[in-house]
């Protein structure tokens, strides 16, 4: 651990192992608080989000009142993120994609509509408040649907090419807001819909997961706490597939840089996972051990979320001007109304639709890992939703980035 004085702030640089230890510590705190506080369980708040928020608030207090900050190792967080998206790809058997079929396409339509609405709200309010319309785009789908990675990439473009000063900082702050809100509103909105429409009865989590027949073909991230029996051989072969997919993803990111098919590394990881899975299974007739993929995927998901929130600099939100905070809260209200009215109705007004709403809230304001955590929290309380675990990871991790990139590029080209 290195210590540096930055201005009047003492900054501690935490290495990869220290970062992992702290992330696990706060993850367990989140798990403990959820188990002890009925409010968190009743509103289906994810354990990594609760633990990560405690960490972020602790960091905020240390920074504001004691002039102490910490810089955590970002490489291990990136690896965990790529492992999560790779697990989504490796779980995407083409037969499962066919199973998603019509529902996947309908949900994608909802997502596309919301991206357009989100940008319309952001840019309209920015104009009404006397700001550049492109600032409204930053507090629209660039950061709220796109997340921190998209915020950084487009922020640099808007600063250097379109003269939007502070676009990167604004983008990071807005993405931070979205990540927090996305993890907080999904569960409560889904609970409201379930209760109002009497869609499901609360079930005991232990009965739902531990007594489930392990032969049942479940979607990735479904039943995250179910006992999964794996061997060392299965673990090694699965780890090899993860390593291959992430290696190819990194290479494709370099090859595609500056070209028309340029995509974020995590999208390449997901896509490579889909190809590897289906090539091995349907061409080479290799048996894929899904339980090992599920274990790696769920572990990386929890740790990544904990680390992402651990690294949040909440004091950036304090620097947002009043008009921008107004836009962000308006976006939150629009998200809740859109998902509760449009997404829920279009997806069938049933239990699966309510769980899909929780997922849509997750990546509509935050990120795909938040969406998965949301639907895990809801299904832990009300029972399984195979459709949600099938649709949300694919739509949130793959299709949404392509849709968002096209929409953002079109708007910038028009207003630029």
Enumerate the predicted regions with their spans.
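C-terminal ends of transmembrane helices
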Residues: 29-41, 87-99, 189, 276-290, ...
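Entry/N-cap segments of selected transmembrane alpha helices
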Residues: 93-123, 175, 239, 295, ...
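Intrinsically disordered, low-complexity non-transmembrane regions of multi-pass membrane transporters
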Residues: 1-14, 20, 27-29, 191-236, ...
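Juxtamembrane and boundary regions of transmembrane helices in multi-pass small-molecule transporters
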Residues: 124-131, 175-219, 333, 341-351, ...
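Hydrophobic transmembrane alpha-helices of secondary-active transporters
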Residues: 26, 53-60, 74-101, 271-280, ...
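Flexible hinge motifs at transmembrane-helix junctions and intramembrane kinks/re-entrant loops
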Residues: 33-49, 61, 66, 70-73, ...
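Alpha-helical membrane segments and immediately flanking helix-loop junctions
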Residues: 125-166, 170-173, 177, 189, ...
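Structural signature of hydrophobic alpha-helical transmembrane segments
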Residues: 11-25, 71-84, 134-141, 260-272, ...
């Amino acid at each position: 651990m290195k210590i540096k004085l930055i201005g009047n702030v003492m900054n501690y640089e935490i290495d990869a192992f220290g970062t992992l230890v702290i992330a696990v510590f706060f993850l367990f705190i989140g798990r403990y608080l959820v188990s002890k506080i009925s409010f968190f369980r009743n509103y289906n708040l994810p354990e990594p989000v609760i633990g990560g928020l405690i960490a972020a608030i602790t960091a905020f207090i240390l920074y504001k009142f004691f002039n102490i900050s910490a810089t955590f190792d970002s490489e291990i967080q990136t690896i965990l993120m790529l492992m999560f998206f790779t697990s989504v790809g490796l779980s995407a058997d083409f037969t499962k994609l066919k199973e998603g079929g019509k529902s996947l396409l309908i949900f994608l339509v909802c997502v596309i509509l919301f991206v357009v609405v989100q940008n319309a709200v952001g840019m309209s309010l920015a104009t009404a408040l006397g700001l550049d319309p492109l600032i409204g785009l930053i507090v629209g789908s660039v950061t709220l649907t796109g997340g921190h990675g998209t915020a950084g990439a487009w922020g640099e473009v808007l600063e250097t090419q379109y003269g939007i000063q502070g676009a990167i900082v604004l983008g990071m702050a807005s993405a931070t807001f979205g990540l927090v809100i996305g993890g907080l509103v999904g569960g409560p909105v889904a609970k409201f819909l379930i209760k109002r429409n009497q869609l499901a009865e609360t079930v005991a989590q232990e009965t739902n997961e531990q007594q489930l027949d392990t032969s049942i073909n479940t979607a990735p991230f479904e039943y995250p706490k179910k006992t999964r029996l794996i061997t060392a051989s299965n673990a090694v072969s699965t780890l090899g597939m993860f390593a291959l997919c992430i290696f190819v993803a990194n290479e494709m990111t370099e090859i595609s840089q500056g070209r028309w098919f340029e995509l974020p590394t995590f999208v390449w990881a997901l896509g490579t996972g889909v190809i590897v899975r289906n090539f091995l299974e349907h061409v080479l007739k290799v048996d894929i051990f899904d339980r090992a993929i599920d274990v790696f995927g769920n572990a990386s998901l929890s740790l990544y979320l904990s680390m992402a929130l651990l690294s949040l600099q909440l004091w950036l939100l304090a620097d947002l001007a009043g008009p921008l905070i107004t836009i962000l809260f308006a976006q939150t209200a629009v998200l809740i109304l859109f998902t509760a009215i449009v997404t829920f109705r279009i997806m069938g007004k049933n239990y699966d639709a309510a769980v899909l709403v929780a997922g849509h809230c997750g990546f509509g304001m935050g990120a795909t890992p938040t969406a998965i955590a949301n639907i895990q929290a809801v299904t832990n309380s009300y029972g399984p939703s195979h459709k949600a675990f099938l649709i949300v990871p694919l739509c949130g991790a793959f299709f949404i980035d392509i849709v968002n990139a096209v929409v953002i590029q079109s708007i910038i080209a028009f207003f630029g």
